[in-house]
Amino acid sequence: KSDGMPTYHFANVVDDHDMKITSVVRGEEWLSSLPSHVTLYNHFGWSPPKFYHLPLILKSTGQGKLSKRDAEEQGHPVFAVQWEESKGFKESGYTPEGILNYLALLGWKGKGDDEKYSLNELVKKFDSKDINKSGARFDIKKAVWINHLHLRDFSSKKILSLCDQANVLLGKKI
C-alpha cells in the first residue's frame, strides 16, 4: 500500500510460509486471489501449499450467501458463539460434536449414506475429491437433526454437564 504497510495478500503468503502451512482451506470467494498468492510464492522461490476452495454456504432458500443478517431474519444462529446481538450455536444448545458434524457436511459428502460422524471419523474419511462444486444450502432442520443424533448417544452425566454449562452461559442458576 502507499502507506508502507504490507497488503493482505503479501502478509498472508509470508505468514503461511513462516508457519510452514501445507494446506489452505478457504471459501470459494478467495478463488480470485489464488493467482496473486501463487505468484508471490513463486517470486520468493517458495513452494505454495495445496489450496482447497470450499463452496459458499447459501441461505436456506438456496439463493445468496448466508450472512449474519440471516440469523436475525430467519431466527437461527450463523456463528459458533454469540456475536453482538445474535445468539450462536452454543447458546442455542448445539453440541460441539453436532455442529462440527453438520458444518463438515456442508459442501462435502463422504462415501456411503452415513451422516453422523465423530471428529476422528471425519478426519479418517475426508477426501478433498469429495468436496462439492456447488454451494451448500444451510438447513437449520438438518442441523437440529444431526445435533440430536449426537445428543441421544451422550451419557446422562454428559447431558447434565451440558445443562450446567448452558445455565452458566445463559446466566441462570438452578
Task: List PLM regions with ranges.
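Catalytic adenosine-cofactor/nucleotide-binding cores of aminoacyl-tRNA synthetases and other
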Residues: S32, H43-I174
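Divalent-metal (Mg2+/Mn2+/Ca2+)-assisted nucleotide/phosphate chemistry catalytic cores
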Residues: K1-H53, Q74
